[in-house]
Amino acid sequence: MPKPNIHPQWYPEAKVYCDGEVIMTVGSTKPELHVDIWSGNHPFFTGTQKIVDAEGRVERFRRKYSGTKPQQTAKGKKAAPKSTPKTNKKG
């Protein structure tokens, strides 16, 4: 027999909310769950292309790499683009 009063309360009909709408009910230790994304509005399942950026990571990446310049060598000259050596094939 389990010890009394050590387990959290179980809510068999906990409501899951997304954008203020109840989307499903599940069993949980919390009476309500709030989610930003679920299968009904996820870009993979809906077929739409949408950037999900909850914390500004995309903007930070774009700011960081938007003004990039070609890397320079130690002497201050621009690095030459790498090219593969050409081979002459006869026959």
Curated annotation (Swiss-Prot):
Any one of the GO BP annotations: translation
Entry-linked Pfam families: Ribosomal_L31
Keywords: Ribonucleoprotein, Ribosomal protein, RNA-binding, rRNA-binding
Region (Disordered): 62-91
GO molecular function: rRNA binding; structural constituent of ribosome
A GO term from the CC aspect: ribonucleoprotein complex
This protein's record includes keyword tRNA-binding: no
Function noted in UniProt: Binds the 23S rRNA.
Family named by the database record: Belongs to the bacterial ribosomal protein bL31 family. Type A subfamily.
Subunit structure: Part of the 50S ribosomal subunit.
Protein name: Large ribosomal subunit protein bL31
Species assigned in the record: Thermosynechococcus vestitus (strain NIES-2133 / IAM M-273 / BP-1)
Gene expressing this chain: rpmE
